[in-house]
Amino acid sequence: MSERFTAVEIISAKRDKYELSDQQIDWTVDAYTRGVIADEQMSALLMAILLNGMNSREISRWTDAMIASGEKMSWSMLDRPTVDKHSTGGVGDKITLPLAPLVAACGAAVPQLSGRGLGHTGGTLDKLESIKGWKASLSNNEMLKVIQECGAVICAAGAGLAPADKKLYALRDVTGTVEAIPLIASSIMSKKIAEGTSALVLDVKTGSGAFMSDPKDAALLARTMVDLGKRAGVSTRALVTAMDVPLGLTAGNSLEIRETLEVLAGGGPSDVVELTLLLANEMLDAVGIKPKVSPADALKNGMAMDVWRKMIKAQGGDNDAPLPVAKEKIEIKADSSGKLLTLDALKVGISAWRLGAGRQKQGEVLQLGAGIEIHAKPGDIVKVGQKILTLHSDEVARFDRAKDALVGAFSIGGVDDPIKRLPLVIERIEG
């Protein structure tokens, strides 16, 4: 079969700062998926995109081409509107876990396709696999059955959704092109648009523990994704939220499930509850639902917990089985008295990863009980010798490297010193 273009033509055009035509973009994504464009050629194009950018039309067409490489899901058979939420990830970010059943309890359908963790950011599926018997991989029919029974499902995305993105993501990871905003936006949105929900709410994290540490970059990414959703006919909005400090009081798989259960029981850390409610209200508003019972009340009265337990059971999970507990633990204590001024999310995340809560490469087996409990947050008054963190691992040998990662992770100042942290919500962006 003769090809319409050559890889060198496409690379040269973007290298020389020309716009790529719709036809060039369609061919490029399709040819790479078919193996006509070699990895080294696509690497050169990705670097040219990183350096020279893409305009909104190019990003939109690139996203459409990735969607077209696979299947597009439909939820038209459901009797309620569908809405999804996507977070760019961070440390202690367990918000999806209480959020999906909460929004379902308030009347929307939530097909939540989630991922696994890599590096210092935790993955939703890894956390849920702390629950005995819980199944991450479902067929489309199984997904539909769970969502019809429970109103929500949290599971892995099937291989048929945007397969071009899977291939490109692996290449970006090893070519220094992960940070290109056009490529990040199209990677996320190709999968989310292919999911077929009528609305999408984005939680774009910023701060030391986030993928986008600069708030300006995070806002640009959020605006780019909201625009892509709008162009695709998906009602899309975004919150840019803080990840300079870990979310909640835990970082690690089973530890975060415990915290989720506290939130669903009407308790839990105030920042986790606040962000869960903010996102729940955004999701319900995005699909035009005015619930009879508010999200805040649905957390307190057990409605959200009921959906959670049904959802876990429907996916094979044992709600009453004990959660994994690490074999060993050590405490990190305050070396002075005063006010806790900072708690660095990145350092906490790296430490949890070294304890066994995260993986260095895909497929690595996790220690589901490993991670960190947080006993004080910025603004808290602490005394010398007071516990700040508890580190959990199955292997004593992991503690030294985990402690090394925590050097400078928190600072203690005078009781009148100002704390140094971002507001929980920095910006709201709507299409």
Per-region residue spans from a language model:
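Acidic, glycine/proline-rich low-complexity segments that act as flexible tails and inter-domain linkers
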Residues: 1-92, 310-314, 425-431
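Well-ordered secondary-structure scaffolds
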Residues: 5, 9, 14, 19-22, ...
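Active-site-proximal beta-alpha loop/turn segments in soluble metabolic enzymes
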Residues: 46-50, 127, 165-174, 203-212, ...
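Alpha-helix C-terminal capping segments
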Residues: 51, 98-111, 191-196, 231-232, ...
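Glycine/serine-rich anion-binding loops at beta->alpha junctions
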Residues: 81-104, 108-120
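Short beta-strand segments
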Residues: 113, 147, 155-157, 203-207, ...
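A glycine-rich helix N-cap at a beta->alpha junction
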Residues: 127-153, 223-229, 233
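Phosphate/diphosphate-binding glycine-rich loops and adjacent basic-rich segments that engage nucleotide
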Residues: 148-197
